[in-house]
Protein backbone atom coordinates (compact mmCIF):
# COMPACT_ATOMS: atom_id res chain seq x y z
CA UNK A 1 0.00 0.00 0.00
CA UNK A 2 2.77 2.42 0.97
CA UNK A 3 4.58 1.51 -2.22
CA UNK A 4 1.47 2.32 -4.31
CA UNK A 5 1.09 5.70 -2.59
CA UNK A 6 4.75 6.43 -3.23
CA UNK A 7 4.34 5.65 -6.93
CA UNK A 8 1.18 7.81 -7.13
CA UNK A 9 2.95 10.75 -5.44
CA UNK A 10 5.89 10.35 -7.77
CA UNK A 11 3.61 10.44 -10.82
CA UNK A 12 1.67 13.43 -9.48
CA UNK A 13 4.94 15.30 -8.91
CA UNK A 14 5.99 14.52 -12.48
CA UNK A 15 2.65 15.85 -13.77
CA UNK A 16 2.88 19.02 -11.64
CA UNK A 17 6.46 19.61 -12.71
CA UNK A 18 5.45 19.15 -16.35
CA UNK A 19 2.63 21.69 -15.92
CA UNK A 20 4.97 24.24 -14.30
CA UNK A 21 7.66 23.70 -16.95
CA UNK A 22 5.08 23.99 -19.74
CA UNK A 23 3.64 27.18 -18.22
CA UNK A 24 7.16 28.59 -17.78
CA UNK A 25 8.02 27.91 -21.43
CA UNK A 26 4.75 29.45 -22.64
CA UNK A 27 5.23 32.51 -20.43
CA UNK A 28 8.78 32.85 -21.73
CA UNK A 29 7.56 32.71 -25.34
CA UNK A 30 4.84 35.28 -24.65
CA UNK A 31 7.33 37.52 -22.82
CA UNK A 32 9.58 37.40 -25.90
CA UNK A 33 6.59 38.24 -28.11
CA UNK A 34 5.54 41.15 -25.88
CA UNK A 35 9.03 42.67 -25.77
CA UNK A 36 10.25 42.13 -29.32
CA UNK A 37 7.32 41.37 -31.60
CA UNK A 38 4.58 43.81 -30.54
CA UNK A 39 4.28 47.59 -30.54
CA UNK A 40 3.58 48.51 -26.92
CA UNK A 41 4.33 51.26 -24.47
CA UNK A 42 6.93 50.56 -21.78
CA UNK A 43 4.18 50.61 -19.13
CA UNK A 44 2.18 47.98 -21.00
CA UNK A 45 5.25 45.77 -21.44
CA UNK A 46 6.10 45.90 -17.73
CA UNK A 47 2.49 45.28 -16.70
CA UNK A 48 2.26 42.13 -18.81
CA UNK A 49 5.66 40.90 -17.68
CA UNK A 50 4.50 41.25 -14.06
CA UNK A 51 1.39 39.22 -14.87
CA UNK A 52 3.47 36.47 -16.50
CA UNK A 53 5.97 36.38 -13.61
CA UNK A 54 3.58 36.51 -10.65
CA UNK A 55 0.83 34.37 -12.19
CA UNK A 56 2.88 31.67 -13.89
CA UNK A 57 0.02 29.18 -14.23
CA UNK A 58 -2.57 31.69 -15.43
CA UNK A 59 -0.48 34.47 -16.96
CA UNK A 60 -0.37 32.96 -20.43
CA UNK A 61 -4.15 32.35 -20.33
CA UNK A 62 -4.76 36.00 -19.41
CA UNK A 63 -2.44 37.04 -22.21
CA UNK A 64 -4.31 34.89 -24.75
CA UNK A 65 -7.62 36.42 -23.65
CA UNK A 66 -6.61 40.02 -22.95
CA UNK A 67 -3.14 40.70 -24.26
CA UNK A 68 -2.81 39.54 -27.84
CA UNK A 69 -2.52 42.33 -30.36
CA UNK A 70 -4.59 42.11 -33.49
CA UNK A 71 -2.83 41.52 -36.79
CA UNK A 72 -2.72 44.67 -38.89
CA UNK A 73 -3.62 42.88 -42.10
CA UNK A 74 -6.44 45.10 -43.28
CA UNK A 75 -9.48 43.77 -41.50
CA UNK A 76 -11.48 46.51 -43.16
CA UNK A 77 -11.04 46.33 -46.90
CA UNK A 78 -12.10 48.76 -49.61
CA UNK A 79 -11.72 48.01 -53.30
CA UNK A 80 -9.15 49.85 -55.41
CA UNK A 81 -11.57 52.10 -57.31
CA UNK A 82 -13.37 53.31 -54.18
CA UNK A 83 -10.04 53.76 -52.42
CA UNK A 84 -8.87 55.96 -55.30
CA UNK A 85 -12.02 58.06 -54.96
CA UNK A 86 -11.47 58.50 -51.22
CA UNK A 87 -7.80 59.37 -51.76
CA UNK A 88 -8.83 61.97 -54.36
CA UNK A 89 -11.15 63.66 -51.84
CA UNK A 90 -8.38 63.66 -49.23
CA UNK A 91 -5.80 65.07 -51.67
CA UNK A 92 -8.19 67.82 -52.78
CA UNK A 93 -8.93 68.79 -49.19
CA UNK A 94 -5.25 68.79 -48.23
CA UNK A 95 -4.58 71.16 -51.13
CA UNK A 96 -7.52 73.35 -50.11
CA UNK A 97 -6.23 73.52 -46.53
CA UNK A 98 -2.81 74.51 -47.76
CA UNK A 99 -4.32 77.36 -49.77
CA UNK A 100 -7.00 78.15 -47.15
CA UNK A 101 -9.54 77.74 -49.93
CA UNK A 102 -12.59 75.99 -48.45
CA UNK A 103 -16.14 76.58 -49.59
CA UNK A 104 -18.34 77.62 -46.64
CA UNK A 105 -15.12 77.89 -44.62
CA UNK A 106 -15.50 79.39 -41.17
CA UNK A 107 -13.05 80.81 -38.69
CA UNK A 108 -12.64 77.52 -36.83
CA UNK A 109 -11.71 75.57 -39.97
CA UNK A 110 -9.02 78.07 -40.90
CA UNK A 111 -7.72 78.28 -37.34
CA UNK A 112 -7.55 74.51 -36.80
CA UNK A 113 -6.38 73.53 -40.26
CA UNK A 114 -3.34 71.69 -38.83
CA UNK A 115 -5.60 69.41 -36.82
CA UNK A 116 -7.91 68.89 -39.80
CA UNK A 117 -4.88 68.07 -41.92
CA UNK A 118 -3.59 65.55 -39.36
CA UNK A 119 -6.90 63.65 -39.27
CA UNK A 120 -7.18 63.86 -43.06
CA UNK A 121 -3.68 62.66 -43.79
CA UNK A 122 -3.51 59.75 -41.38
CA UNK A 123 -7.17 58.70 -41.08
CA UNK A 124 -8.80 59.79 -44.35
CA UNK A 125 -11.25 61.69 -42.13
CA UNK A 126 -12.54 64.02 -44.83
CA UNK A 127 -13.96 67.35 -43.71
CA UNK A 128 -17.59 68.22 -44.35
CA UNK A 129 -18.89 71.75 -43.88
CA UNK A 130 -22.65 71.57 -44.48
CA UNK A 131 -23.89 69.78 -41.38
CA UNK A 132 -26.74 70.39 -38.97
CA UNK A 133 -26.35 68.82 -35.52
CA UNK A 134 -28.64 68.05 -32.60
CA UNK A 135 -27.11 67.24 -29.21
CA UNK A 136 -28.67 64.71 -26.82
CA UNK A 137 -27.78 64.44 -23.15
CA UNK A 138 -30.87 62.44 -22.17
CA UNK A 139 -31.57 58.90 -23.35
CA UNK A 140 -35.35 59.22 -23.60
CA UNK A 141 -35.16 62.14 -26.02
CA UNK A 142 -32.48 60.44 -28.09
CA UNK A 143 -34.35 57.17 -28.48
CA UNK A 144 -37.68 58.91 -29.13
CA UNK A 145 -36.09 60.71 -32.09
CA UNK A 146 -34.25 57.60 -33.26
CA UNK A 147 -37.45 55.52 -33.28
CA UNK A 148 -39.25 58.24 -35.23
CA UNK A 149 -36.42 58.38 -37.78
CA UNK A 150 -36.55 54.58 -38.10
CA UNK A 151 -40.29 54.75 -38.76
CA UNK A 152 -39.72 57.36 -41.48
CA UNK A 153 -37.03 55.33 -43.30
CA UNK A 154 -37.82 54.44 -46.92
CA UNK A 155 -34.67 52.79 -48.33
CA UNK A 156 -32.26 51.43 -45.72
CA UNK A 157 -31.25 51.49 -42.07
CA UNK A 158 -27.71 50.64 -40.99
CA UNK A 159 -27.62 50.11 -37.25
CA UNK A 160 -24.44 49.47 -35.25
CA UNK A 161 -24.07 49.36 -31.45
CA UNK A 162 -21.62 47.92 -28.97
CA UNK A 163 -24.44 46.91 -26.62
CA UNK A 164 -27.99 45.99 -27.61
CA UNK A 165 -29.76 44.63 -24.55
CA UNK A 166 -32.51 42.03 -24.77
CA UNK A 167 -34.82 44.15 -22.59
CA UNK A 168 -37.81 46.44 -23.10
CA UNK A 169 -35.99 49.17 -25.05
CA UNK A 170 -33.88 46.66 -26.99
CA UNK A 171 -36.94 44.67 -28.03
CA UNK A 172 -38.82 47.87 -28.92
CA UNK A 173 -36.00 49.01 -31.22
CA UNK A 174 -35.66 45.54 -32.78
CA UNK A 175 -39.41 45.40 -33.33
CA UNK A 176 -39.38 48.78 -35.10
CA UNK A 177 -36.46 47.66 -37.25
CA UNK A 178 -38.25 44.39 -38.01
CA UNK A 179 -41.36 46.27 -39.17
CA UNK A 180 -39.27 48.27 -41.64
CA UNK A 181 -37.65 45.08 -42.92
CA UNK A 182 -41.14 43.63 -43.52
CA UNK A 183 -41.96 46.75 -45.55
CA UNK A 184 -39.01 46.07 -47.86
CA UNK A 185 -36.53 48.50 -46.29
CA UNK A 186 -32.97 47.15 -46.13
CA UNK A 187 -32.15 46.79 -42.44
CA UNK A 188 -28.74 45.65 -41.24
CA UNK A 189 -27.67 45.36 -37.60
CA UNK A 190 -24.04 45.02 -36.57
CA UNK A 191 -23.54 44.28 -32.87
CA UNK A 192 -20.49 43.45 -30.79
CA UNK A 193 -20.45 39.80 -29.78
CA UNK A 194 -19.14 40.53 -26.27
CA UNK A 195 -21.05 43.72 -25.56
CA UNK A 196 -24.35 42.27 -26.79
CA UNK A 197 -23.88 38.75 -25.42
CA UNK A 198 -27.37 38.92 -23.87
CA UNK A 199 -28.84 39.33 -27.36
CA UNK A 200 -27.20 36.71 -29.56
CA UNK A 201 -29.35 34.47 -31.76
CA UNK A 202 -32.58 34.11 -29.74
CA UNK A 203 -33.06 37.84 -29.28
CA UNK A 204 -32.53 38.43 -33.00
CA UNK A 205 -34.73 35.60 -34.28
CA UNK A 206 -37.96 37.67 -34.64
CA UNK A 207 -36.02 40.42 -36.43
CA UNK A 208 -34.40 37.95 -38.82
CA UNK A 209 -37.72 36.21 -39.46
CA UNK A 210 -39.09 39.54 -40.70
CA UNK A 211 -36.30 39.87 -43.28
CA UNK A 212 -33.69 41.80 -41.30
CA UNK A 213 -29.99 41.00 -41.45
CA UNK A 214 -27.72 40.92 -38.38
CA UNK A 215 -24.05 40.15 -37.90
CA UNK A 216 -21.83 39.90 -34.82
CA UNK A 217 -18.45 41.64 -34.69
CA UNK A 218 -15.62 39.22 -33.84
CA UNK A 219 -17.98 36.39 -32.85
CA UNK A 220 -16.64 33.71 -30.54
CA UNK A 221 -15.88 30.33 -32.06
CA UNK A 222 -15.87 28.78 -28.60
CA UNK A 223 -18.93 28.43 -26.32
CA UNK A 224 -17.63 30.33 -23.26
CA UNK A 225 -14.42 32.08 -24.34
CA UNK A 226 -13.83 34.76 -26.96
CA UNK A 227 -10.14 34.89 -27.86
CA UNK A 228 -10.66 38.39 -29.25
CA UNK A 229 -12.38 39.69 -26.12
CA UNK A 230 -9.72 42.40 -25.82
CA UNK A 231 -10.55 44.03 -29.18
CA UNK A 232 -14.18 45.03 -29.21
CA UNK A 233 -16.16 47.21 -31.58
CA UNK A 234 -17.23 50.03 -29.30
CA UNK A 235 -18.73 52.14 -32.11
CA UNK A 236 -22.34 53.35 -32.09
CA UNK A 237 -23.45 54.36 -35.58
CA UNK A 238 -26.86 54.66 -37.23
CA UNK A 239 -27.35 55.73 -40.85
CA UNK A 240 -30.88 56.15 -42.23
CA UNK A 241 -31.38 56.56 -45.99
CA UNK A 242 -27.99 58.25 -46.21
CA UNK A 243 -29.66 61.41 -44.89
CA UNK A 244 -29.53 61.07 -41.11
CA UNK A 245 -26.73 59.78 -38.90
CA UNK A 246 -26.32 59.12 -35.19
CA UNK A 247 -23.06 58.80 -33.26
CA UNK A 248 -22.16 59.10 -29.58
CA UNK A 249 -22.07 57.34 -26.25
CA UNK A 250 -25.54 55.83 -25.73
CA UNK A 251 -25.94 52.08 -26.16
CA UNK A 252 -29.34 50.38 -26.50
CA UNK A 253 -30.95 49.20 -23.27
CA UNK A 254 -33.21 50.16 -20.39
CA UNK A 255 -30.32 51.27 -18.19
CA UNK A 256 -29.54 54.04 -20.71
CA UNK A 257 -33.01 55.40 -20.01
CA UNK A 258 -32.14 55.64 -16.31
CA UNK A 259 -34.02 52.49 -15.32
CA UNK A 260 -31.10 50.74 -13.63
CA UNK A 261 -31.30 50.57 -9.82
CA UNK A 262 -27.53 50.30 -9.69
CA UNK A 263 -26.73 53.39 -11.78
CA UNK A 264 -29.87 55.51 -11.68
CA UNK A 265 -29.96 58.37 -14.18
CA UNK A 266 -27.70 57.77 -17.19
CA UNK A 267 -25.91 60.93 -18.36
CA UNK A 268 -24.44 60.60 -21.83
CA UNK A 269 -23.89 62.63 -24.99
CA UNK A 270 -25.01 61.69 -28.50
CA UNK A 271 -25.38 63.50 -31.83
CA UNK A 272 -27.94 63.45 -34.62
CA UNK A 273 -26.29 64.60 -37.84
CA UNK A 274 -27.84 65.75 -41.11
CA UNK A 275 -25.28 66.62 -43.78
CA UNK A 276 -22.36 65.15 -45.67
CA UNK A 277 -20.77 63.87 -42.44
CA UNK A 278 -23.40 61.11 -42.70
CA UNK A 279 -21.40 59.80 -45.67
CA UNK A 280 -18.39 59.34 -43.38
CA UNK A 281 -20.52 57.40 -40.89
CA UNK A 282 -21.85 55.32 -43.78
CA UNK A 283 -18.34 54.52 -44.97
CA UNK A 284 -17.35 53.43 -41.47
CA UNK A 285 -20.42 51.19 -41.18
CA UNK A 286 -19.84 49.57 -44.57
CA UNK A 287 -16.21 48.82 -43.72
CA UNK A 288 -17.22 47.27 -40.40
CA UNK A 289 -20.15 45.34 -41.87
CA UNK A 290 -18.23 43.92 -44.83
CA UNK A 291 -15.41 42.80 -42.52
CA UNK A 292 -17.80 40.52 -40.60
CA UNK A 293 -20.67 39.67 -42.94
CA UNK A 294 -20.72 36.15 -44.31
CA UNK A 295 -23.10 37.36 -47.03
CA UNK A 296 -24.96 40.50 -48.13
CA UNK A 297 -21.87 42.66 -48.52
CA UNK A 298 -22.65 46.33 -49.08
CA UNK A 299 -21.37 48.00 -52.24
CA UNK A 300 -20.02 51.54 -52.42
CA UNK A 301 -22.53 52.77 -54.99
CA UNK A 302 -24.31 56.14 -55.02
CA UNK A 303 -27.39 54.74 -53.31
CA UNK A 304 -25.50 54.68 -50.03
CA UNK A 305 -23.81 58.06 -50.52
CA UNK A 306 -26.54 60.44 -51.72
CA UNK A 307 -26.33 64.21 -51.82
CA UNK A 308 -27.70 65.67 -48.59
CA UNK A 309 -29.46 69.02 -48.48
CA UNK A 310 -29.16 69.95 -44.82
CA UNK A 311 -28.88 73.71 -45.06
CA UNK A 312 -26.32 73.46 -42.26
CA UNK A 313 -22.95 75.18 -41.99
CA UNK A 314 -21.20 73.14 -39.28
CA UNK A 315 -17.77 71.65 -39.99
CA UNK A 316 -17.38 67.99 -38.96
CA UNK A 317 -14.74 65.31 -39.34
CA UNK A 318 -15.61 61.70 -38.49
CA UNK A 319 -12.44 60.00 -37.25
CA UNK A 320 -12.12 56.36 -36.33
CA UNK A 321 -9.41 54.40 -34.58
CA UNK A 322 -8.66 50.82 -33.67
CA UNK A 323 -5.96 48.19 -33.25
CA UNK A 324 -5.82 47.82 -37.03
CA UNK A 325 -4.65 51.43 -37.43
CA UNK A 326 -1.02 52.52 -37.47
CA UNK A 327 -1.80 55.73 -35.55
CA UNK A 328 -3.98 56.40 -32.49
CA UNK A 329 -6.00 58.98 -34.38
CA UNK A 330 -8.68 59.88 -31.84
CA UNK A 331 -6.05 60.19 -29.12
CA UNK A 332 -3.98 62.42 -31.42
CA UNK A 333 -7.07 64.50 -32.11
CA UNK A 334 -7.64 64.96 -28.38
CA UNK A 335 -3.99 65.89 -27.82
CA UNK A 336 -4.03 68.40 -30.67
CA UNK A 337 -7.13 70.02 -29.24
CA UNK A 338 -5.67 70.21 -25.72
CA UNK A 339 -2.38 71.68 -26.96
CA UNK A 340 -4.27 74.36 -28.90
CA UNK A 341 -6.27 75.56 -25.87
CA UNK A 342 -5.79 79.19 -24.85
CA UNK A 343 -8.71 79.78 -22.47
CA UNK A 344 -10.59 76.68 -21.37
CA UNK A 345 -10.82 72.89 -21.54
CA UNK A 346 -13.90 70.89 -20.53
CA UNK A 347 -13.59 67.09 -20.38
CA UNK A 348 -16.19 64.48 -19.54
CA UNK A 349 -15.15 60.83 -19.52
CA UNK A 350 -16.34 57.82 -17.50
CA UNK A 351 -12.91 56.22 -17.74
CA UNK A 352 -9.91 58.52 -17.40
CA UNK A 353 -6.75 56.40 -17.64
CA UNK A 354 -4.56 58.04 -20.30
CA UNK A 355 -0.81 57.63 -20.54
CA UNK A 356 1.64 59.99 -18.84
CA UNK A 357 2.20 62.09 -21.97
CA UNK A 358 -1.55 62.75 -22.16
CA UNK A 359 -1.68 63.71 -18.47
CA UNK A 360 1.33 65.97 -18.96
CA UNK A 361 -0.39 67.79 -21.84
CA UNK A 362 -3.28 68.62 -19.51
CA UNK A 363 -0.89 69.75 -16.77
CA UNK A 364 0.99 71.97 -19.23
CA UNK A 365 -2.27 73.61 -20.31
CA UNK A 366 -3.35 74.22 -16.70
CA UNK A 367 0.06 75.53 -15.61
CA UNK A 368 -0.04 77.85 -18.62
CA UNK A 369 -3.22 79.51 -17.34
CA UNK A 370 -5.87 77.51 -19.20
CA UNK A 371 -9.02 76.82 -17.16
CA UNK A 372 -9.13 73.01 -17.16
CA UNK A 373 -12.23 71.18 -15.91
CA UNK A 374 -12.67 67.40 -15.77
CA UNK A 375 -15.82 65.52 -14.80
CA UNK A 376 -15.79 61.81 -13.90
CA UNK A 377 -18.38 59.44 -12.36
CA UNK A 378 -18.88 59.12 -8.62
CA UNK A 379 -19.85 55.45 -8.79
CA UNK A 380 -18.07 52.50 -10.43
CA UNK A 381 -19.32 50.24 -13.18
CA UNK A 382 -15.86 48.62 -13.37
CA UNK A 383 -14.09 48.88 -9.95
CA UNK A 384 -10.45 48.76 -11.09
CA UNK A 385 -11.16 51.31 -13.81
CA UNK A 386 -12.99 53.56 -11.35
CA UNK A 387 -10.12 53.69 -8.85
CA UNK A 388 -7.51 54.19 -11.57
CA UNK A 389 -9.66 57.02 -12.98
CA UNK A 390 -9.84 58.68 -9.57
CA UNK A 391 -6.08 58.47 -9.04
CA UNK A 392 -5.31 59.87 -12.51
CA UNK A 393 -7.74 62.75 -12.19
CA UNK A 394 -6.47 63.59 -8.68
CA UNK A 395 -2.88 63.64 -9.96
CA UNK A 396 -3.80 66.80 -11.89
CA UNK A 397 -5.03 68.79 -8.88
CA UNK A 398 -1.62 70.24 -8.00
CA UNK A 399 -1.40 71.73 -11.51
CA UNK A 400 -4.62 73.66 -10.92
CA UNK A 401 -7.00 71.34 -12.78
CA UNK A 402 -10.53 71.30 -11.36
CA UNK A 403 -12.01 67.80 -11.00
CA UNK A 404 -15.69 67.09 -10.40
CA UNK A 405 -17.60 63.95 -9.44
CA UNK A 406 -20.97 63.57 -11.18
CA UNK A 407 -23.40 62.62 -8.39
CA UNK A 408 -26.73 62.37 -10.22
CA UNK A 409 -26.42 58.78 -11.48
CA UNK A 410 -23.74 57.57 -13.88
CA UNK A 411 -21.70 59.77 -16.23
CA UNK A 412 -20.93 58.00 -19.52
CA UNK A 413 -20.41 61.08 -21.70
CA UNK A 414 -17.23 61.30 -23.81
CA UNK A 415 -16.79 64.98 -24.69
CA UNK A 416 -13.97 67.46 -25.06
CA UNK A 417 -14.59 71.19 -25.57
CA UNK A 418 -11.85 73.74 -26.24
CA UNK A 419 -12.11 77.55 -25.98
CA UNK A 420 -15.83 77.61 -26.99
CA UNK A 421 -14.62 76.89 -30.53
CA UNK A 422 -14.16 73.18 -31.24
CA UNK A 423 -15.42 69.98 -29.66
CA UNK A 424 -15.36 66.22 -29.92
CA UNK A 425 -18.21 63.81 -29.20
CA UNK A 426 -18.09 60.09 -29.76
CA UNK A 427 -17.46 56.64 -28.37
CA UNK A 428 -13.83 56.95 -27.25
CA UNK A 429 -13.02 57.18 -23.56
CA UNK A 430 -9.76 58.74 -22.42
CA UNK A 431 -8.01 55.47 -21.69
CA UNK A 432 -5.64 52.93 -23.16
CA UNK A 433 -8.47 50.60 -24.15
CA UNK A 434 -10.22 53.19 -26.31
CA UNK A 435 -7.03 54.64 -27.75
CA UNK A 436 -5.34 51.35 -28.62
CA UNK A 437 -7.46 48.21 -28.22
CA UNK A 438 -11.07 48.94 -29.16
CA UNK A 439 -12.61 50.13 -32.42
CA UNK A 440 -13.94 53.65 -31.85
CA UNK A 441 -15.45 56.58 -33.77
CA UNK A 442 -15.66 60.29 -32.87
CA UNK A 443 -17.02 63.44 -34.44
CA UNK A 444 -14.63 66.41 -34.35
CA UNK A 445 -16.74 69.54 -34.62
CA UNK A 446 -15.56 72.97 -35.75
CA UNK A 447 -18.36 75.28 -34.66
CA UNK A 448 -18.68 77.86 -31.89
CA UNK A 449 -22.38 77.33 -31.21
CA UNK A 450 -22.04 73.57 -30.78
CA UNK A 451 -18.96 74.03 -28.59
CA UNK A 452 -20.84 76.51 -26.41
CA UNK A 453 -23.83 74.15 -26.08
CA UNK A 454 -21.58 71.29 -24.99
CA UNK A 455 -19.79 73.55 -22.53
CA UNK A 456 -23.15 74.67 -21.13
CA UNK A 457 -24.16 71.02 -20.69
CA UNK A 458 -21.02 70.57 -18.56
CA UNK A 459 -21.86 73.68 -16.53
CA UNK A 460 -25.44 72.45 -16.02
CA UNK A 461 -24.03 69.17 -14.70
CA UNK A 462 -22.07 71.07 -12.04
CA UNK A 463 -25.36 71.63 -10.20
CA UNK A 464 -25.48 67.88 -9.48
CA UNK A 465 -21.75 67.36 -9.02
CA UNK A 466 -19.22 67.80 -6.21
CA UNK A 467 -15.68 69.10 -6.56
CA UNK A 468 -12.78 66.81 -5.72
CA UNK A 469 -10.49 69.20 -3.85
CA UNK A 470 -6.99 68.41 -2.63
CA UNK A 471 -8.22 68.54 0.98
CA UNK A 472 -11.05 66.11 0.27
CA UNK A 473 -8.80 63.73 -1.66
CA UNK A 474 -6.20 63.73 1.13
CA UNK A 475 -8.81 62.33 3.55
CA UNK A 476 -9.37 59.09 1.63
CA UNK A 477 -8.85 55.90 3.63
CA UNK A 478 -5.89 53.50 3.47
CA UNK A 479 -8.19 50.96 1.83
CA UNK A 480 -9.00 53.39 -1.00
CA UNK A 481 -5.31 54.21 -1.38
CA UNK A 482 -4.59 50.49 -1.67
CA UNK A 483 -7.29 50.03 -4.34
CA UNK A 484 -5.95 53.04 -6.23
CA UNK A 485 -2.41 51.67 -6.11
CA UNK A 486 -3.38 48.23 -7.41
CA UNK A 487 -5.59 49.75 -10.10
CA UNK A 488 -2.84 52.13 -11.18
CA UNK A 489 -0.41 49.22 -11.44
CA UNK A 490 -2.85 47.35 -13.67
CA UNK A 491 -3.96 50.41 -15.67
CA UNK A 492 -1.83 49.64 -18.77
CA UNK A 493 -3.82 46.43 -19.26
CA UNK A 494 -7.27 47.54 -18.06
Curated annotation (Swiss-Prot):
Its main location: membrane. GO terms for molecular function: cardiolipin synthase activity. Its EC number is 2.7.8.-. GO terms for cellular component: plasma membrane. Residues 229-256, 407-434 form the PLD phosphodiesterase domain. It holds the Pfam family PLDc_2. Gene3D superfamilies: Endonuclease Chain A. GO terms for biological process: cardiolipin biosynthetic process. It is a multi-pass membrane protein. SUPFAM superfamilies: Phospholipase D/nuclease. Catalyzes the reversible phosphatidyl group transfer from one phosphatidylglycerol molecule to another to form cardiolipin (CL) (diphosphatidylglycerol) and glycerol. This is Cardiolipin synthase.
Amino acid sequence: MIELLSIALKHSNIILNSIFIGAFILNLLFAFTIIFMERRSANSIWAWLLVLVFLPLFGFILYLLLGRQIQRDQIFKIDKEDKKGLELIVDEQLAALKNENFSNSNYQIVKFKEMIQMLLYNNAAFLTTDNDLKIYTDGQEKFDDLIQDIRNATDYIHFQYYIIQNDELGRTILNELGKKAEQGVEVKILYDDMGSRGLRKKGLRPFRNKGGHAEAFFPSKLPLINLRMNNRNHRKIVVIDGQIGYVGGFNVGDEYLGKSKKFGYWRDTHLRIVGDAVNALQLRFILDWNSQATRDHISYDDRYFPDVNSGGTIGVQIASSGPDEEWEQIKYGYLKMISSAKKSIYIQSPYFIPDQAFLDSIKIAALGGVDVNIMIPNKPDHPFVFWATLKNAASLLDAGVKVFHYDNGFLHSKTLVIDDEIASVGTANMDHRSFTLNFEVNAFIYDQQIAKKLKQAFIDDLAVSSELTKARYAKRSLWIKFKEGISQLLSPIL
